[in-house]
């Protein structure tokens, strides 16, 4: 008798398991995997910030270890990224935003590369990394757009919109088009790379023994990390551009 919980689902694209909420249809499988990713990040953060050991005098006995060391390394990495992209004056307030974006995309991408979501069969569609769904990547890109508009307007007020006619008024359509293409490029780049990686691995696993797809899976881990870094770096660059003083 076939066990529906451990049947390998077929590789499919564009099929969704819909949840009905009022008059709206929600992509259930995306919400499930997104909640799992958020839970994993939350647990790691909670465990990594318990019983914090302060460093005094560079002593090895008081140096952070384990998850605390990992969380401090990630925090310093995000802080340095924000400082490089946004600038010394404004970077600190944007560290939480860039850190959240980076961690969510990183863990989502790696969950798609490491967790065999497809062994769990759904009534329709299949489980996959949250970033394998265009709705997720578009939402992340729109959040980034809102963030850099907010950053620019909060610092410069309505004077922020002078950038659209700088250095010449005839550049107005081009500058508007640039702001429209930023979220498009962010969302489709991330979605396309993650979808392609999961499809290639899924097809290889179904056609050949498990050992053969391993190099592709390792490459997928590397690509997943790079995509998270690229998204966070571009988000920081866009915010830095919006708060930059033009003379």
Curated annotation (Swiss-Prot):
F-type ATPases have 2 components, CF(1) - the catalytic core - and CF(0) - the membrane proton channel. CF(1) has five subunits: alpha(3), beta(3), gamma(1), delta(1), epsilon(1). CF(0) has four main subunits: a, b, b' and c. Belongs to the ATPase A chain family. The gene is atpI. Keywords: ATP synthesis, CF(0), Chloroplast, Hydrogen ion transport, Ion transport, Membrane, Plastid, Thylakoid, Transmembrane, Transmembrane helix, Transport. It holds the Pfam family ATP-synt_A. This is ATP synthase subunit a, chloroplastic. It is found in: Plastid, Chloroplast thylakoid membrane. PANTHER family: ATP SYNTHASE SUBUNIT A, CHLOROPLASTIC. One of its GO terms (cellular component) is proton-transporting ATP synthase complex. Coiled coil: none annotated. NCBIfam families: ATP_synt_6_or_A (TIGR01131). It is a multi-pass membrane protein.
């Amino acid at each position: 008798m076939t066990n529906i919980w451990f049947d390998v689902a077929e590789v499919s694209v564009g099929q969704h398991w819909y949840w009905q909420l009022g008059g709206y249809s929600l992509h259930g499988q995306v919400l499930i995997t997104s909640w799992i990713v958020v839970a994993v990040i939350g647990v790691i953060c909670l465990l990594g910030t318990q019983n914090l050991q302060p460093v005094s005098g560079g002593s090895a006995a008081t140096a952070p270890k384990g998850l605390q060391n990992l969380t401090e390394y990630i925090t310093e990495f995000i802080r340095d990224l924000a400082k490089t992209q946004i600038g010394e004056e404004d970077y600190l307030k944007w560290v939480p935003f860039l850190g959240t974006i980076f961690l969510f995309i990183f863990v989502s991408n790696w969950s798609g590369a490491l967790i065999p979501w497809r062994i769990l069969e759904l009534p329709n569609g299949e489980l996959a990394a949250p970033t394998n769904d265009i709705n997720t990547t578009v939402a992340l890109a729109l959040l980034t757009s809102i963030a850099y508009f907010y950053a620019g307007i909060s610092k410069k007020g309505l004077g922020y919109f002078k950038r659209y006619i700088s250095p010449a008024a005839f550049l107005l359509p081009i500058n508007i088009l640039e702001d429209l293409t930023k979220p498009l490029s962010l969302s489709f780049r991330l979605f396309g790379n993650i979808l392609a990686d999961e499809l290639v691995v899924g097809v290889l696993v179904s056609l050949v023994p498990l050992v053969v797809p391993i190099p592709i899976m390792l490459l997928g881990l590397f690509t997943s990390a790079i995509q998270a870094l690229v998204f966070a770096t571009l988000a920081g660059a866009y915010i830095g551009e919006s708060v930059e003083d033009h003379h």
